[in-house]
């Protein structure tokens, strides 16, 4: 049986470029455990240039093959692609649109679902439409005096707020604000990352995460895990990835009742199905001291670094990551043929 030529595409050039490379390491190691795949790892930079791990400049063509700048190298036909790209252009849905155009099968959520989840404003509209509780918010479409006034009013009403660039991941462009004098500066910074900004009420709560993925035709939601941050901090980019991070992750959240756990899992599956996600996601919730459950955000291509929760929760649920990838890829290619 011939091997599947699998393109492992990583990087992307966004603020999460280096994290994407770390995740790609995990995918590459997992795929190497199967004899089904011939894997070519290619990094995409912020200028849209492709380069193999061996340093060869190349491009993905409309004919679904990798062509090398060195024309003496034989083009490499691509059967399947894993876009291991956090942020733009992967989680934004842009690169999936291109794959659809050239009819190249790919791993992960499709273009529209990716875009809807990546934009925090659009995502919250979907959460509300699906009847899933989420945090109170306002959104802003330009940086001006009116935006500053609206944000200061929200701060006065809620006591503490988060100002977030609407289309960034890994807490990029995300700021906790308790002082009205800082509103203008924070808004200016947030608008530097995205054309839209969302302002949310700060919720004092536990941060719980659920891995939701497709396995043998079923949508699976794991028991919630938990992010435990250092005192008076939130889960910033540095807290997520710095070697000296004081944040802790528990694959299984402690002291969560079976009833609450099941409700969180039910909301997660409802969001996955309702927003037509595919293959994988990590869905994050807040759990308040009063046991109020609030959907925070959905990550359509969760990190797979050594400290990332998605692969740990999948494994804890009893599923092997390599087998999971094989099932998804083979099922998709069989359906296509």
From Swiss-Prot:
It catalyses: 2 D-alanine + ATP = D-alanyl-D-alanine + ADP + phosphate + H(+). ATP binds at residues 154-209. Mg(2+) 2 binds at residues 297, 299. Keywords: ATP-binding, Cell shape, Cell wall biogenesis/degradation, Cytoplasm, Ligase, Magnesium, Manganese, Metal-binding, Nucleotide-binding, Peptidoglycan synthesis. GO terms for biological process: cell wall organization; peptidoglycan biosynthetic process; regulation of cell shape. One of its GO terms (cellular component) is cytosol. Pathway: Cell wall biogenesis; peptidoglycan biosynthesis. InterPro entries: ATP-grasp, ATP_grasp_subdomain_1, D-Ala_lig_Van_CS, D_ala_D_ala, Dala_Dala_lig_C, Dala_Dala_lig_N, PreATP-grasp_dom_sf. It is found in: Cytoplasm. Gene3D superfamilies: 3.40.50.20, ATP-grasp fold, A domain, ATP-grasp fold, B domain. Its cofactor is Mg(2+); Mn(2+). Binds 2 magnesium or manganese ions per subunit. One of its GO terms (molecular function) is ATP binding. Its EC number is 6.3.2.4. It holds the Pfam family Dala_Dala_lig_N. It comes from the Bacteria. Residues 124-330 form the ATP-grasp domain. SUPFAM superfamilies: Glutathione synthetase ATP-binding domain-like, PreATP-grasp domain. Mg(2+) 1 binds at residues 284, 297. It is an enzyme of class 6 (ligase). Cell wall formation. Belongs to the D-alanine--D-alanine ligase family. PANTHER family: D-ALANINE--D-ALANINE LIGASE, D-ALANINE--D-ALANINE LIGASE A. This is D-alanine--D-alanine ligase. It comes from Shewanella baltica (strain OS195).
